[in-house]
Amino acid sequence: MLRTAKAAGVKTVAISSSAYKAHGGVLLDEADIAIDCKVPHGDAVIEVGAAKMGGLSTYASMFILNSILIEGAKKALARGVTPPIYTSGNVEGGTAKNIALEERYFGRVRRL
């Protein structure tokens, strides 16, 4: 996916662990901006039967991503720009706000 985005001229950001090498290379080496979460390979911590899941790299990467999004939103507000924040459906009025955002950005962002 990163290579496809780069080929299309999109600036890429990767959050990964340098300890794990997949697909014959290191994702962090190919991204324009690379953030190493520093989690060692084999980081699954929850045993489910004979398997392990719940990799700490996932938690670390999502923490990093959310921190970036929060700081970006704060900086936008400080500059007088209201960022389009998708709201939890568990928050009162969240669903209505999200529908308005989906209508505004229809065609640009596909619904999951």
Roles of regions detected by a PLM:
Residues 1-70:
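Glycine-rich phosphate-binding loops that contact phosphosugars or nucleotide phosphates
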Residues 95-112:
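C-terminal and late-domain segments of enzyme folds
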